[in-house]
C-alpha cells in the first residue's frame, strides 16, 4: 500500500484502497465532506466574531476555546450514546443533520454593525453548540466503524495505513475549505464595491466606538480610500457601517457552504452505509443478545488496564493539542496582524495559512507512510508511543522557529495604537508556512497513528466514546 501517488484518476484511488475493506473509501469520502464544511467555518470563526460583533482577541478566543471544549465533551457523550445503543450508523446520520442545523443558524445574515449584541451573539453561540453536539454524534462513531472494519483478521495488519488514508482524506477537504471561505467573503465584498483588508473591520469598530488614536484614524482614512472602488469616502461613519456589513455578510454566506458540504456527506453516507459494519446485526447473528461476544470475553481487569493505558497516552499528547489548536487562534491573529499578506504579486488573506497544514498533510502522508513501511520491513519501526514522543519533539521545534522569527515585532498594544502595521513592518509569510510545515510533520507522527492505536486498545463496549480520546487534534477539531 506504500507509497501513495497523489495525482490521478479514479483507478489510482481504487488501487490505494485495493487491500483495504470496501467500506473505507465511502467512509473517508463522507468524512471528507463533513470536514470540508467544518474547516470552512473554522478558517474564519475568530475573525468572524471580531468583525461581526466587534469582539477583541481575548473574548473571541474565549468563545473559540469554549467551542473546542464543547466538541471534546459532547464527542464523549455522542460516543456513549452510540456505544449504549450500538446504533452507530443512526447516530452518525443524526449528527450530520444536527450539524447542518447549526451551520444554518450562523449562516443566516443578520444586521451588521450589531445593535443588539446579547441577542445575536447568543444565537451564534447556540449555533456553535449545535454544531459541536452534531460533531460529537458523528466523528468518533464514524472512526469506530472504520476501526471495526480492521477487527477482521484479513485486514488487521493494514490498520495503521488504513487510518492514515482515512486521515489524508480529511485533509483533502481541509485544504480547500479556507480558500472557499475567502473566495465567498471577497466575492461579496466586491459586489458592494470593496476590496479585502484585514485591518479594516477592527478600525471600523474603533471608529464607530470613538476609540481610534490619531495614528489609527489616519490609517483608517487611507485604507478606506484604498479599498473603495468609488474613491475615497466622504462620510466615514457610513463607510464603516457598509464595510462591516459587507465583510460579515460574506462570512455568513461562507458558512452556508458548510451546509452544502453536510448534505453531500449525508448523501455519500446513505448511499454506501450497507458497506459499513453494523454491530447490531453482528449481535443478532451471534448471541442474539445486546452484548457483543468480544465484550463478554474481555475481563473487567483488562478493560481497566486498557483505559488506563489510553489515559496515560492522552495525558502526554494533550500538550501537543495545546500547540496544534493555535492554528485557528494565535497563529491566525499573527497572520492578520504581523504577517506580510503577499508573495511577490500574489495577494494573500489571513485565513489562507490554515490551508498550509492540510496541504502538507496530504503531500507528506505518502512520505511518512513510506518511511514507516521501510522501517517496518527492516524490523525497526518505532512503537506508537515512540512515534508520539518523536512527534512532540518536532512540534516543539516548530514553535522555536516561530519564536525566533517573531523576535523584534511590536507588541500588540503598539500595533493597535498604530491601527495596524504597514507591509514593510510585517514578517515574511514563509515564517508561518515553515512553522506549519514542521508542525505537520509532528502531527503525522501522532494523529493518524493515534486513532489506530485507540481503535485497537479501546474496549469494544467503549469504542465510540474512547475514540474521541485519541491523540488526533485534527480529527476531533475537526
Give the location of each predicted region.
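C-terminal ends and interior cores of transmembrane alpha-helices
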Residues: 97-116, 394-411
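Glycine-rich segments within core transmembrane alpha-helices of 12-TM secondary carriers
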Residues: 164-178, 470, 474
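Central cavity-lining transmembrane alpha-helices of secondary-active solute carriers
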Residues: 65-80, 359-367
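Cytoplasmic membrane-interface "Motif A"-like loop-to-helix N-cap segments
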Residues: 84-96, 374-390
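Single conserved hydrophobic/aromatic residue that forms the stacking wall/gate
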Residues: 1-8, 13, 468, 473-478
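Intracellular loop-helix junctions on the cytosolic face of multi-pass helical membrane proteins
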Residues: 9-10, 14-22, 152-160, 181-349, ...
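Pair of pore-lining "gating" transmembrane helices in MFS-fold secondary transporters
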Residues: 20-43, 310-323, 437
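Hydrophobic core of transmembrane alpha-helices in multi-pass small-molecule transporters
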Residues: 119-138, 419, 427-442
Amino acid at each position: 500500500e506504500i507509497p501513495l501517488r497523489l495525482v490521478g484518476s479514479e483507478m489510482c484511488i481504487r488501487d490505494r484502497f485495493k487491500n483495504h475493506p470496501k467500506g473505507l473509501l465511502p467512509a473517508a469520502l463522507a468524512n471528507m465532506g463533513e470536514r470540508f464544511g467544518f474547516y470552512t467555518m473554522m478558517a474564519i470563526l475568530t475573525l468572524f466574531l471580531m468583525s461581526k460583533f466587534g469582539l477583541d482577541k481575548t473574548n473571541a478566543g474565549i468563545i473559540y476555546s469554549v467551542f473546542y471544549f464543547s466538541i471534546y465533551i459532547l464527542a464523549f457523550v455522542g460516543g456513549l450514546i452510540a456505544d449504549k445503543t450500538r446504533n452507530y450508523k443512526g447516530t452518525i446520520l443524526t449528527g450530520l443533520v444536527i450539524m447542518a442545523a447549526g451551520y444554518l443558524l450562523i449562516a443566516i445574515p443578520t444586521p451588521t454593525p450589531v445593535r443588539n449584541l446579547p441577542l445575536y451573539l447568543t444565537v451564534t453561540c447556540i449555533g456553535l453548540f449545535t454544531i459541536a453536539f452534531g460533531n460529537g454524534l458523528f466523528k468518533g462513531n464514524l472512526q469506530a466503524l472504520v476501526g471495526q472494519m480492521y477487527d477482521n483478521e484479513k485486514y488487521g495488519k493494514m490498520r495503521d495505513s488504513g487510518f492514515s488514508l482515512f486521515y489524508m482524506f480529511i485533509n483533502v477537504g481541509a485544504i480547500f475549505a479556507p480558500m472557499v471561505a475567502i473566495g465567498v467573503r471577497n466575492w461579496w465584498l466586491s459586489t458592494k464595491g470593496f476590496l479585502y483588508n484585514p485591518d479594516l473591520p477592527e478600525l471600523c469598530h474603533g471608529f464607530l466606538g470613538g476609540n481610534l488614536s490619531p495614528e489609527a484614524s489616519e490609517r483608517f482614512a487611507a485604507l478606506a480610500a484604498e479599498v473603495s472602488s468609488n474613491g475615497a469616502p466622504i462620510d466615514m461613519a457610513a463607510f464603516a457601517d457598509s464595510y462591516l456589513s459587507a465583510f460579515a455578510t460574506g462570512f455568513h454566506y461562507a458558512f452556508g457552504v458548510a451546509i452544502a458540504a453536510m448534505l453531500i456527506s449525508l448523501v455519500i453516507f446513505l448511499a454506501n452505509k450497507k458497506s459499513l459494519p453494523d454491530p447490531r446485526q453482528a449481535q443478532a447473528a451471534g448471541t442474539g443478545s445486546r452484548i457483543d461476544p468480544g465484550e463478554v470475553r474481555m475481563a473487567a481487569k483488562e478493560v481497566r488496564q486498557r483505559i488506563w493505558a489510553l489515559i496515560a497516552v492522552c495525558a502526554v499528547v494533550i500538550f501537543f493539542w495545546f500547540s496544534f489548536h493555535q492554528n485557528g487562534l494565535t497563529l491566525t491573529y499573527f497572520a492578520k496582524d504581523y504577517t506580510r499578506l503577499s508573495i511577490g504579486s500574489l495577494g494573500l488573506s489571513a485565513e489562507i495559512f490554515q490551508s498550509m497544514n492540510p496541504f502538507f498533510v496530504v503531500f507528506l502522508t505518502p512520505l511518512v507512510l513510506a518511511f514507516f513501511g521501510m522501517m517496518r520491513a527492516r524490523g525497526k519501526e518505532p512503537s506508537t508511543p515512540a512515534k508520539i514522543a518523536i512527534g512532540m519533539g518536532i512540534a516543539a521545534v516548530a514553535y522555536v522557529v516561530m519564536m525566533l522569527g517573531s523576535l523584534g515585532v511590536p507588541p500588540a498594544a503598539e500595533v493597535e495604537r498604530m491601527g495596524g502595521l504597514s507591509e514593510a513592518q510585517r514578517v515574511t509569510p514563509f515564517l508561518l508556512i515553515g512553522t506549519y510545515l514542521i508542525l505537520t510533520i509532528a502531527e503525522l507522527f501522532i494523529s493518524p497513528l493515534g486513532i489506530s492505536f485507540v481503535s485497537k486498545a479501546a474496549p469494544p463496549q467503549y469504542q465510540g466514546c474512547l475514540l474521541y480520546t485519541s491523540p488526533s487534534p485534527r480529527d476531533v477539531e475537526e
